[in-house]
A protein has these predicted regions:
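Haloarchaeal acidic low-complexity proteome signature biased toward cell-envelope/secretome components but also
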Residues: 1-84, 95-101, 131, 158-161, ...
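Short secondary-structure capping micro-motifs at structural edges
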Residues: 75, 87-92, 124-127
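Conserved active-site alpha-helix within GNAT-family acetyltransferase domains
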Residues: 142-165
Length: 224
């Protein structure tokens, strides 16, 4: 896999993703944010087309590439960015320029929950780049328990704040992971538990993580 920073917000990079495979694909063509990606080569792509294995991050998808909807007339596969496995957009926080705000994070549908931790790995990569760029903190707002749990693996913790869109805000210092506590982790999960319209997978996940401690950091972030 290759991690690549396509540019910061001032460079106005854009990326055209296959909207059939990536959530929020339209957010990557509008500009105004930085973009980073994980790419895979052809061999990895072939392996990735094998059935996904469910992990504790979110329900694995089993999308068959051959079953994708047909593209409309005038749109060709070649117009989409090739070999992208995950992508992220980001820009300075509107109220604090020392904080980098992650705007959108998306993983190709057949790779979600396959155990490779592509989303957390891409966030960790971006955090290292943000440190070199002089940011003090990095933040993200999430709307589901799976993403919330995954962000704890790269040193984010719940801030006890929500956005106007009912998303939970997590952040961490740039230089080191935030100190996670069981009580703080569970407070965020409790917010999701109180919501209506949860999927069966979300209900099961929240039940399984009742009284659980925060997940371990990715191995690359753990202190020796």
């Amino acid at each position: 896999m290759e991690f690549a920073l396509l540019g910061w917000a001032e460079a106005d990079p854009t990326l055209r993703l296959d909207y059939r495979r990536f959530s929020y694909a339209g957010k990557f063509v509008t500009g105004g944010t930085g973009v980073a990606v994980i790419r895979g080569d052809a061999a990895e792509r072939a392996a990735d087309d094998a059935p996904a294995v469910e992990s504790d991050d979110e329900t694995a998808a089993d999308t068959d590439p051959e079953s994708l909807a047909s593209l409309p007339d005038g749109v060709a596969e070649s117009e989409f960015a090739d070999e992208v496995l995950a992508a992220i957009t980001f820009s300075p926080d509107r109220t604090d320029s020392s904080t980098l705000k992650i705007r959108y994070l998306t993983v190709r549908d057949d790779l979600r929950g396959d155990g490779k931790q592509l989303g957390p790995q891409l966030v960790a990569f971006l955090t290292s780049k943000a440190a070199a760029a002089g940011y003090d903190r990095i933040a993200i707002a999430v709307n589901n328990a799976f993403s919330y749990h995954a962000l704890y693996k790269v040193g984010f913790t719940y801030t006890d704040r929500e956005t106007g869109l009912a998303e939970l805000v997590l952040d961490r210092p740039i230089g080191e992971p935030a100190v996670a506590s069981q009580s703080g982790y569970q407070r965020g999960l409790d917010v999701f538990r109180e919501r209506e319209g949860l999927s069966a997978a979300e209900i099961e996940f929240l039940s399984d993580h009742s009284n659980a401690v925060p997940p371990r950091l990715l191995s690359s972030l753990r202190q020796s």
